[in-house]
C-alpha cells in the first residue's frame, strides 16, 4: 500500500528495471559495443518482463492520499525564482513550432514566451524573475523517473547502430508521438513533417538580456526524418527530440549531451567560462562535477582519482562513456 510508483504491481517494477538497463546499455555502446548489445538484448527480451511501452506504464512519483508530497521542482520556480524558461529549449520549440511549448511553460497575456539565455547577472534581475516564462508545475505535478518516450528513443538509437531490431525511423517517430501524448497535445503528424530549424538567438529576442546572441541553426536538424541522411544526422535527430521529450529531466538531458554532443546548445555568455574549469574556450557545458574539497582531507583514496578519471578532478574532464568522435558544435 506504500508503493508510490507502481501501486503494488510488481510487473511494472520489472518494466522500469529493464528500461533502466536499456538506458545504461545504450549509454556505453560507443565504448563497449559487445557489452551494450548483451544488455540491450536482455532488456528487450519480453520473457524478462518487457520495458515501458505506454504512457500508463511510465515510472513517476506524485502526491497521493496515502502519502502527500510536493513536487521538488516547485520551490525553485515559485519560492526562489531560480527556474525559468531557458533560451535553448525555447529556440528549438519556437523554431519547430512545437505545440508542447505551451504545455510546458507559461506565456504572457499576449501569448509570447519570454526565455532567459545562459548568461550572467543581467538575467537575474527581479524583472527577469517576474517576467520570464515559468515551468508549468504545481504541488501535485508528478516527478517522472522514466517515460515511455525515452524508451522509444533508446530503441531507435539501438536500432540505428544495429544493436537491436526495429526500424530507426519508426521508433524515432514513435518516441515523438509518445512525448506529445505524455504532454497532452495534438498535432504530431504535422510536426513530424516540419523541415524548419531552431531559431538563431538575436539581441531583439531576449527582453532581459539584449547583449546576447547565438547562431544555433548551423549544422542543426529539423524534426522530419530523411532515410537518405547519414547515421550521424539521424543520431542528431534522435537525441534532439529525446532532449525535448526528457524535459524536465535536466540531468539525463545533460548526460546525453555529454555522451553524444547533441543537441547543440546555446553558448555561455561569458566566453571564458569553460577555461575556468580546465577546458577549451569553445566548449559549451561542464563534463562533470568536481569532488567536494572535504574529500581531499578525509578520503585516502583521492590520490587515485586522476588514474580512474583519465584526467584531473576538473569540470572539463570527460567521463569514460563519452564517445571518442563526439562532434564539436559549429561556431
Residue ranges of model-derived segments:
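Structured, solvent-exposed acidic/aromatic patches
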Residues: 1-187, 228-233
Amino acid at each position: 500500500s506504500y508503493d508510490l510508483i507502481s501501486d503494488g504491481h510488481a510487473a511494472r517494477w520489472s518494466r522500469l528495471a529493464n528500461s533502466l538497463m536499456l538506458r545504461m546499455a545504450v549509454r556505453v555502446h560507443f565504448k563497449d559495443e559487445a557489452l551494450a548489445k548483451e544488455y540491450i538484448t536482455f532488456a528487450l527480451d519480453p520473457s524478462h518482463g518487457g520495458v515501458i511501452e505506454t504512457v500508463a506504464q511510465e515510472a513517476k512519483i506524485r502526491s497521493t492520499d496515502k502519502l502527500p508530497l510536493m513536487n521538488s521542482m516547485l520551490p525553485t520556480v515559485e519560492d526562489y525564482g531560480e527556474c525559468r524558461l531557458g533560451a535553448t529549449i525555447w529556440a528549438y520549440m519556437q523554431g519547430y513550432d512545437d505545440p508542447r511549448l505551451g504545455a510546458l511553460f507559461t506565456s504572457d497575456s499576449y501569448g509570447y514566451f519570454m526565455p532567459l539565455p545562459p548568461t550572467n547577472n543581467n538575467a537575474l534581475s527581479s524583472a527577469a524573475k517576474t517576467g520570464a516564462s515559468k515551468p508549468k508545475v504545481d504541488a501535485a505535478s508528478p516527478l517522472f523517473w522514466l517515460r515511455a518516450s525515452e524508451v522509444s528513443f533508446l530503441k531507435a538509437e539501438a536500432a540505428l547502430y544495429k544493436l537491436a531490431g526495429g526500424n530507426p525511423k519508426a521508433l524515432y517517430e514513435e518516441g515523438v508521438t509518445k512525448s506529445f501524448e505524455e504532454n497532452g497535445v495534438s498535432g504530431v503528424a504535422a510536426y513530424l513533417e516540419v523541415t524548419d530549424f531552431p531559431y538563431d538567438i538575436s539581441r531583439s529576442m531576449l527582453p532581459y538580456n539584449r547583449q546576447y546572441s547565438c547562431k544555433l541553426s548551423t549544422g542543426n536538424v529539423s524534426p522530419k526524418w530523411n532515410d537518405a541522411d547519414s547515421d550521424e544526422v539521424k543520431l542528431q535527430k534522435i537525441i534532439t527530440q529525446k532532449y525535448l521529450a526528457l524535459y524536465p529531466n535536466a540531468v539525463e538531458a545533460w548526460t546525453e549531451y555529454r555522451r553524444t554532443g547533441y543537441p547543440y546548445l546555446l553558448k555561455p555568455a561569458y566566453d571564458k567560462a569553460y577555461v575556468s574549469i580546465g577546458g577549451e574556450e569553445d566548449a559549451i557545458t561542464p563534463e562533470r562535477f568536481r569532488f567536494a574539497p572535504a574529500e581531499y582531507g578525509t578520503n585516502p583514496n583521492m590520490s587515485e582519482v586522476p588514474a580512474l578519471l583519465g584526467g584531473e578532478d576538473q569540470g572539463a574532464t570527460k567521463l569514460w562513456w563519452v564517445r571518442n568522435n563526439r562532434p564539436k558544435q559549429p561556431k
